[in-house]
């Protein structure tokens, strides 16, 4: 008969993953609500206790304990066992450590522990209370993985470990984050709930007001703590404990003595130092980790003029000096993961301890009754000692003597066994008194145990007494300070920025940088670092307190505070926008750059190839939340082939639009409505089907130039294009040819005075002695031509101008720009 079964892969995967999920939920990642332990932690404690590796004895090699645990109870690899053992020994992760370790057991800096062959470990004293009375049949046991011996499914837990040490873990579909608490406060809450089973959460929080982290710190948000205790979920703010320390010379330093729970100290120090290195906050001189055996200490030395409180607020907001701790109190309750609140945790623990105390009392009572039975037999023997001795002497052997005792004097099997094994020295008068005292003590003990078993009030008194004993022995002061309200950190970012002079440069391909005046002045403009196929389109002197706006050909705008730009040498290429802006496209280019002091006022005009135009307000470009990683739209393009042709600040002048086919239209800028960033604008010029916009510019002079793709150039009077309304076709400025027709490559105003500087992106740079406006043309063969536009004579409107060289017509224009 075949053992092969036909099953669908879908059914098999679902069923097997269901098994796996159930296993890791119940047997790996989540703690039991009763003892607060995960299976691996429970197995470590039980195995070490079973092997006698306890508090009152010497340390043993960790590797030996790990081997015993792995071989007997936890066959999942030595590293997982050792990691769990190490964590239970780390006093910065546990409020009460359960394992004491000799040797390197890691650090708050995230250093790994020494290998287990080098370290030694034993159970801590308080861990013994978790295992107390386990030998008295108080908890259920189950077979281990190979059915060779049994292990406990839960520990007796003489204190509420789940709340005291907390827990964290990730399972299939579940995760848990339960913070540690102060032992004394937890026990006080348990004792109160024993006396008041229906106690309100508000009353319980008078005894247990909130978590108590082993690393101290300040916990803010009483309402969130209450919410977490009520629902099992919540979030509190955990802030480092800091103080401002005065130094010589009027300087100050910020001292950190406590940091938030589970924050890596070395990483924190590195992040704070990165703030100094990147000059995100001016005024930090040095960051030092001065921690030693006496405790944690981080020193942040400040400059003399620095605002210590502002710097501290910045560090609290942007580093792990302050973090959010998220409560997610999930535990295994009756084999099921549940999100539990404080009342449920306490009631489950009380119920568990009730079972433990009753089972322990039953065990002790049975043992006492058995001993009382023996003692009663021995006392009776002493009253008829001579007869008993004679009977034993006349017996053939031990078995015969036992049988004779049972038949002749009605002793039980247990009493007969005790009599025949009785040592002769026990037959003295002193021993008779001892036996009588023992009988009285046993009867009192049995009465007490019976009361515990039969009377709930007596049992609860025992529970409270034992909890108070634990509290008395292990009580320690609260480490974390609780504050009712979460303080909102407000930072005047502008006040943090040191005002420095710098030079900002931008290339068409999207490379940008800022350069110190020293580096800039040590080089010439032509020595700027850039790729061979790229073009420098913007250089300007600016202050680090100002802002840079970059407008692209795809209708996107990118914002950068000047102080956030990478400070590089003038000869360095710079940082490409694609390194930080996730939606910067490969074919995207920078069209226009602008440095602004504020966003309060100012208008821009944008014109697209499809002939649409719009004005928009600078206020709408105020920094958005994701500016560091994403650009935002300033104009909506009509299709994928559409591009922005012109972007410039708005002035109260006419606008002149020139199409590739040679149509020019002039109208007032006031005809263009101010619209939102996501609009496409209105029709600026009426285009034929095969036409598109080549250039658009503000009319600020009496003439303008037109350059064609064949290298023909002309200058004509602005008055030849009379002002009309937008959305018209315009007038031709080229003469149409049947063969090799001219098409507009670039058009722009011809400036004859310094008023042109606001449109010249290079005007803030020291120039040559002449202020003439030059047109630079590069042909497709790499030839460069320069023409002084002001020297051109005016041409008629319908003419094609003159070629700038005899060969340019065959080469055609690749790049053209004015300067």
Swiss-Prot record:
Residues carrying the site annotation Interaction with DNA: 38, 74, 76, 87, 93
GO function term, MF aspect, one: ATP binding
EC number of this enzyme: 5.6.2.2
Known catalytic reactions: ATP-dependent breakage, passage and rejoining of double-stranded DNA
CDD domains: TOP4c
Keywords attached to this entry: Cell membrane, DNA-binding, Isomerase, Membrane, Topoisomerase
One biological process term in Gene Ontology: DNA topological change
Active site feature: 118 (o-(5'-phospho-dna)-tyrosine intermediate)
InterPro entries: GyrA/parC_rep, Gyrase/topoIV_suA_C, Topo_IIA-like_dom_sf, Topo_IIA_A/C_ab, Topo_IIA_A_a_sf, Topo_IIA_dom_A, TopoIV_A_Gpos, Type_II_DNA_Topoisomerases
Subcellular location, principal: membrane
Residues flagged as site, Transition state stabilizer: 117
Signal sequence extent: none
Recorded GO CC terms: chromosome; cytoplasm; DNA topoisomerase type II (double strand cut, ATP-hydrolyzing) complex; extrinsic component of plasma membrane
Source organism superkingdom: Bacteria
HAMAP family for this protein: ParC_type2
Similarity comment: Belongs to the type II topoisomerase GyrA/ParC subunit family. ParC type 2 subfamily.
NCBIfam families, per the entry: parC_Gpos (TIGR01061), PRK05561.1 (NF004044)
Complex formation: Heterotetramer composed of ParC and ParE.
Role played: Topoisomerase IV is essential for chromosome segregation. It relaxes supercoiled DNA. Performs the decatenation events required during the replication of a circular DNA molecule.
Protein name: DNA topoisomerase 4 subunit A
Annotated organism of origin: Streptococcus pyogenes serotype M1
Protein encoded by which gene: parC
